[in-house]
Regions:
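Conserved Lys-Pro-Asp/Glu-containing loop-to-beta segment of HAD-superfamily phosphomonoesterases
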Residues: 109-122
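Alpha-helical substrate-recognition element adjacent to the catalytic core
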Residues: 1-104
Length: 122
């Protein structure tokens, strides 16, 4: 059985609106500093967080092996600013292990290579 592969943006998974507003007002340097200063503060769940949590819960219903659902994070953040996102993933116990951080580039080109059948964005 092949898993359902769900690609999700960081902004759909977590509430990044405060940082995004800062980015729009003051630019990338201010945004990066803001995220680094708060890397140990968990992000709040975003609009698609409840759905992702429920999809990943399906993995615990079946015997070990190939999970029925895999969630992949696609983010326009850099790997540096993305540390806060991965810390939040760990904080909430989400089983997300594959991710792409594009440092501002479009994330859409990664959907097909990861084999995603569903793409969630906010």
């Amino acid at each position: 059985m092949r898993p359902l592969v769900v690609a999700i943006t960081a902004r759909a998974l977590f509430d990044l609106e405060d940082g995004h507003a800062l980015f729009e007002r003051e630019g990338l340097k201010a945004y990066a500093a803001y995220q680094r200063e708060r890397e140990d503060q968990p992000l709040q769940p975003g609009i698609a967080f409840p759905l992702v949590r429920k999809l990943l819960a399906l993995n615990s219903l079946l015997p070990p092996g190939v999970p029925p659902v895999e969630v992949i994070l696609l983010s326009r953040n850099s790997a540096d600013t993305g540390l806060r996102i991965f810390n939040a993933i760990e904080h909430f116990g989400l089983g997300i292990v594959r991710a792409v951080f594009t440092s501002g580039a479009d994330t859409h080109p990664y959907i097909q290579p990861f084999g995603a059948q569903l793409f969630l964005s906010a």
